[in-house]
Swiss-Prot record:
Pfam families, per database record: Ribosomal_S14
Keywords: Ribonucleoprotein, Ribosomal protein, RNA-binding, rRNA-binding
Binding partners and assembly: Part of the 30S ribosomal subunit. Contacts proteins S3 and S10.
Organism in which the protein naturally occurs: Rhizobium johnstonii (strain DSM 114642 / LMG 32736 / 3841)
Keyword Ribosomal protein: yes
HAMAP family in alphabetical order: Ribosomal_uS14_1
Name under which the protein is recorded: Small ribosomal subunit protein uS14
Record-linked InterPro entries: Ribosomal_uS14, Ribosomal_uS14_bac/plastid, Ribosomal_uS14_CS
GO CC, alphabetical: cytoplasm; small ribosomal subunit
Example of a GO biological process term: translation
Function statement: Binds 16S rRNA, required for the assembly of 30S particles and may also be responsible for determining the conformation of the 16S rRNA at the A site.
Length: 101
């Protein structure tokens, strides 16, 4: 089981990203627009740098919904391989059966 603080920090980052997404996208569009003067683009760059770092989408870590584990994460199922195996063996995940041949 992952530390509760790490899971909560990641949740807080997700909300920050959601709140800052439109503002960051607007500033990035200004920065990338070659038609605008360099001074205006530089000011937008400074504003973007002053926004909270946790507002960046790359700061989010995919974590298992069951255990909070950050590694070996299956995006489709939103859980780690260990939680998938445990729940699959119990028959809690539809369509997952232990293979035998």
């Amino acid at each position: 089981m992952a530390k509760t603080s790490a899971v909560e920090k990641n949740k807080r980052r997700r909300t920050t990203v959601a709140n800052q997404a439109a503002k960051r996208a607007g500033l990035k569009a200004i920065i990338m627009n070659q038609a605008l003067p360099i001074e205006e683009r530089f000011k937008a760059s400074i504003k973007l740098a002053s926004l909270p770092r946790d507002g960046s989408k790359t700061r989010i870590r995919n974590r298992c919904e069951v255990s909070g584990r950050p590694r070996a994460y299956y995006r489709k199922l939103r859980m780690s391989r260990i939680a998938l195996r445990e729940l699959g063996n119990l028959g809690k995940v539809p369509g997952i059966v232990k293979s035998s041949w």
